[in-house]
């Protein structure tokens, strides 16, 4: 049973990869299907090896680590106006509104654990809305961080790009991975795949008129 499931999964992954190639060549979004976890992980592996404390992955949108979030002077000097902490909480990166109270920084916390069984998807839309609201102001600059800036924070940024920038999961991964070495855990990747399927279905039903389903 397990062997058969593996073969089916690999076959599906190769089929999706072939369809992705066709879509890239012909520009036909109707041929897109959500790739399997292995194919998606390969996209991350092909990305940038760059892994510093913080990297800009989209205009004025940065993914960073705990050290970046704790450096109040550095945040102020860099001009950050918003912070989304994907590892909020006493036993994670324990900052919060009070930590930035004397700074011109708007804070949003997501109390999440970096384990495959944690349901981060319940925060996808609220986190994406916070990022989108911040970036609507041309003078804003947002840091999305967790402990290492690789899994939780990257997952929320990917969800934002999918929800508000009309990207497929593949597009979003390629955008982020070319600027920072990230890799969501398998559980988060599964949740992003489900979001991708939902958004693709909704957009096909809505037609070309509605581009931003996050609103």
UniProtKB/Swiss-Prot annotation:
Subcellular location: Cytoplasm; Nucleus
Sequence ranges assigned to domain Tyrosine-protein phosphatase in this UniProt record: 53-201
Top-level taxon of origin: Eukaryota
PROSITE patterns linked: TYR_PHOSPHATASE_1, TYR_PHOSPHATASE_2, TYR_PHOSPHATASE_DUAL
GO CC term (a single one): nucleus
Reported induction: Deletion of the long non-coding RNA (lncRNA) H19 leads to a decreased DUSP29 expression in muscle (at protein level). Down-regulated in muscle of high-fat diets-induced glucose-intolerant mice. Induced during neurogenic skeletal muscle atrophy.
Enzyme Commission no: 3.1.3.16, 3.1.3.48
Biological processes annotated in GO: glucose homeostasis; muscle cell differentiation; negative regulation of ERK1 and ERK2 cascade; protein dephosphorylation
Keywords for this protein: Cytoplasm, Hydrolase, Nucleus, Protein phosphatase
Annotated positions binding substrate: 145-152
Keyword Lyase: no
Major site of localization recorded for this protein: cytoplasm
Tissues where this protein is expressed: Skeletal muscle, liver and adipose tissue.
Record SUPFAM superfamilies: (Phosphotyrosine protein) phosphatases II (SSF52799)
CDD domains membership: DUPD1 (cd14575)
Any one Gene Ontology molecular-function term assigned to this protein's record: protein tyrosine phosphatase activity
Keyword check for Cytoplasm: yes
Catalytic activity: O-phospho-L-tyrosyl-[protein] + H2O = L-tyrosyl-[protein] + phosphate; O-phospho-L-seryl-[protein] + H2O = L-seryl-[protein] + phosphate; O-phospho-L-threonyl-[protein] + H2O = L-threonyl-[protein] + phosphate
Record-annotated active site: 146
PANTHER family noted in UniProt: AGAP008228-PA (PTHR45682), DUAL SPECIFICITY PHOSPHATASE 29 (PTHR45682:SF6)
Record function comment: Dual specificity phosphatase able to dephosphorylate phosphotyrosine, phosphoserine and phosphothreonine residues within the same substrate, with a preference for phosphotyrosine as a substrate. Involved in the modulation of intracellular signaling cascades. In skeletal muscle regulates systemic glucose homeostasis by activating, AMPK, an energy sensor protein kinase. Affects MAP kinase signaling though modulation of the MAPK1/2 cascade in skeletal muscle promoting muscle cell differentiation, development and atrophy.
Family: Belongs to the protein-tyrosine phosphatase family. Non-receptor class dual specificity subfamily.
Subunit-structure text: Homodimer. Interacts with PRKAA2.
Entry protein name: Dual specificity phosphatase 29
Organism, as annotated: Mus musculus (Mouse)
């Amino acid at each position: 049973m397990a062997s058969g499931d593996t073969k089916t999964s690999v076959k599906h992954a190769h089929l999706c990869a072939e369809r992705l190639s066709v879509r890239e060549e012909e520009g036909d979004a109707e041929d897109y299907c959500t790739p399997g976890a292995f194919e998606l992980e390969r996209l991350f592996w092909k990305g940038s090896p760059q892994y510093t404390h913080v990297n800009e992955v989209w205009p004025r949108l940065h993914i960073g680590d705990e050290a970046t979030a704790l450096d109040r002077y550095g945040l102020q000097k860099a001009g950050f106006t918003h912070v989304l902490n994907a590892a909020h909480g006493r036993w994670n990166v324990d900052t919060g509104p009070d930590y930035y109270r004397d700074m011109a920084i708007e804070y949003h916390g997501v109390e999440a654990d970096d384990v495959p069984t944690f349901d981060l998807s319940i925060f996808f839309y609220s986190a994406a809305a916070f990022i989108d609201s911040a970036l609507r102001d041309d003078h804003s600059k947002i840091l999305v961080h967790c402990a290492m800036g690789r899994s939780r924070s990257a997952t929320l940024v990917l969800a934002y790009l999918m929800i508000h920038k009309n990207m497929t999961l593949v597009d979003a991964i390629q955008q982020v991975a070319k600027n920072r070495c990230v890799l969501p855990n398998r559980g988060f990747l599964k949740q992003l795949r489900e979001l991708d399927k939902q958004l693709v279905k909704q957009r096909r039903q809505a037609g070309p008129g509605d581009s931003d389903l996050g609103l």
